[in-house]
């Protein structure tokens, strides 16, 4: 029984049978402690020769719960100062005749949650340096290992994609472009390295939409060639005010993760979907521009993106990113942070919903917003305040034009 931080636990479920062949990290038993149930994984691969515990029985750390026959000791790494699995000679006579020099088997100290995270990320726990009590591996140890080895592909046990060999007449192969590969790599790296949390909210934009439609109508009457202003410039401006009000959202984490850099400029990137690729042109000094200027610049950059004419200067020095899917549909989603930024705002399709005003239900246009943030830098309370502030800006046009 490995050390899971409790002296004694009760066995509530036995997940394997005698004679069954098990794999590394496969669940053996489920135990229940003072606060939660947890699954105890196998530290080795082998065949179950005996089960020494029963359901309802209480077991202590280091007590024998099962005995295995292991066919390949050469693949088992030796380490000192770790608990090891004991083998009874009388139950393994045939095996001991072939391998008399029994070596200690490594028992990695990690909770089932940490083990599942490692399996999901294809990380071998034996390569992790533990920092927890009693040499226990923590989730932070895995995150540190990944950050230190992201550029070194050989550090991971990347499993080959065992795609079924379909008959070639039954499917078409679509090559992944270089830009898609680069974008995919960056998205994966950001998702793995940044602890994402997403805050959701709805904003009443009824008055804003009335103002916007009236403004566009008047502009069209004066100049039929004038482009309509969409809701996005208003959102960009509200985000600019939010970044000034909450500077922690306009920051980046240092490489050594010990310092936060607060930026003295306000640049907002806009995710643009272009022919199966994703570009993020950046609007510079958003806090110093009015909504009409932002609308013109947004149209200009979007056109450059669709014509594949964006250069590096158009996509650098971003502080915060907005991903707008409102023109497509859907409600909420969890956008991936664009590192080294610490937050991103997702915008979905606005819908008419009944809103109670204290006396009656009023049809109101509600805009879903999804704020993903780096939990190492931003706490949940600040995220709620930031999103509430954005909602305040959008629900009353006077705040945006002052």
UniProtKB/Swiss-Prot annotation:
GO cellular component: cytoplasm
Cofactor: (R)-lipoate
UniProt cross-references to SUPFAM superfamilies, sorted A to Z: CoA-dependent acyltransferases (SSF52777), Peripheral subunit-binding domain of 2-oxo acid dehydrogenase complex (SSF47005), Single hybrid motif (SSF51230)
Sites of N6-lipoyllysine modification: 35
One Pfam assignment: 2-oxoacid_dh
Location of the Peripheral subunit-binding (PSBD) domain: 109-146
Reactions accelerated catalytically: N(6)-[(R)-dihydrolipoyl]-L-lysyl-[protein] + acetyl-CoA = N(6)-[(R)-S(8)-acetyldihydrolipoyl]-L-lysyl-[protein] + CoA
Sequence intervals crossing the membrane: none
Its biological purpose: The pyruvate dehydrogenase complex catalyzes the overall conversion of pyruvate to acetyl-CoA and CO(2). It contains multiple copies of three enzymatic components: pyruvate dehydrogenase (E1), dihydrolipoamide acetyltransferase (E2) and lipoamide dehydrogenase (E3).
Family label: Belongs to the 2-oxoacid dehydrogenase family.
PANTHER family registered for this protein in UniProt: DIHYDROLIPOAMIDE ACETYLTRANSFERASE COMPONENT OF PYRUVATE DEHYDROGENASE COMPLEX (PTHR43178), DIHYDROLIPOYLLYSINE-RESIDUE ACETYLTRANSFERASE COMPONENT OF PYRUVATE DEHYDROGENASE COMPLEX (PTHR43178:SF2)
Complexes and interactors: Forms a 24-polypeptide structural core with octahedral symmetry.
Designated name of the protein: Dihydrolipoyllysine-residue acetyltransferase component of pyruvate dehydrogenase complex
Underlying gene: aceF
């Amino acid at each position: 029984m490995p050390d899971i931080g409790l002296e004694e636990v009760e066995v509530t479920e036995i997940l394997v049978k005698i004679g069954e062949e098990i794999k590394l990290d496969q669940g053996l038993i489920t135990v229940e402690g003072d606060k939660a149930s947890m699954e105890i994984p196998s530290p080795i691969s082998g065949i179950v020769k005996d089960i020494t515990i029963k359901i309802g029985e209480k077991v202590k750390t280091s007590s024998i719960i099962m005995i295995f026959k292991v066919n390949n000791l050469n693949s088992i790494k030796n380490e000192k100062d770790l608990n090891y699995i004991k083998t009874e000679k009388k139950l393994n006579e045939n095996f001991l005749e072939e391998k008399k020099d029994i070596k200690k088997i490594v028992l990695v100290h990690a909770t089932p949650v940490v083990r599942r995270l490692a399996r999901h990320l294809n990380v071998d726990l034996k390569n992790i340096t533990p920092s927890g009590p009693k040499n226990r591996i923590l989730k932070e140890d895995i995150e540190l290992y990944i950050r230190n080895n992201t550029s070194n592909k050989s550090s991971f046990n990347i499993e080959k994609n065992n795609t079924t060999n379909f008959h070639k007449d039954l499917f078409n192969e679509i090559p992944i472009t270089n830009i898609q590969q680069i974008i995919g790599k960056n998205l994966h790296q950001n998702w793995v390295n940044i602890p994402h949390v997403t805050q959701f909210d709805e904003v009443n934009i009824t008055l804003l939409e009335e103002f916007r439609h009236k403004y566009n109508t008047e502009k069209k009457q004066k100049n039929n060639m004038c482009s309509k202003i969409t809701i996005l410039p208003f959102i960009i401006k509200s985000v600019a005010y939010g970044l000034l009000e909450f500077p922690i959202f306009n920051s980046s984490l240092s490489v050594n993760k010990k310092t936060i850099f607060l930026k003295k400029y306000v640049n907002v990137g806009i995710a643009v979907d272009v022919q199966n690729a994703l570009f993020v042109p950046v609007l510079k000094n958003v806090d110093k521009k009015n909504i009409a200027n932002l609308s013109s610049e947004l149209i200009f950059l979007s056109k450059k993106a669709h014509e594949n004419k964006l250069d590096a200067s158009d996509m650098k020095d971003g502080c915060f990113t907005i991903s707008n899917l409102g023109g497509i549909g859907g409600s909420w989603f969890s956008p991936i942070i664009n590192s080294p930024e610490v937050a991103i705002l997702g915008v979905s399709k606005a819908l008419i919903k009944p809103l109670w005003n204290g006396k009656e239900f009023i049809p109101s246009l509600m805009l879903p917003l999804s704020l993903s943030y780096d939990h190492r830098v931003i706490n949940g309370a600040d995220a709620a305040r930031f999103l509430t502030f954005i909602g305040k800006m959008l629900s009353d046009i006077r705040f945006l034009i002052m």
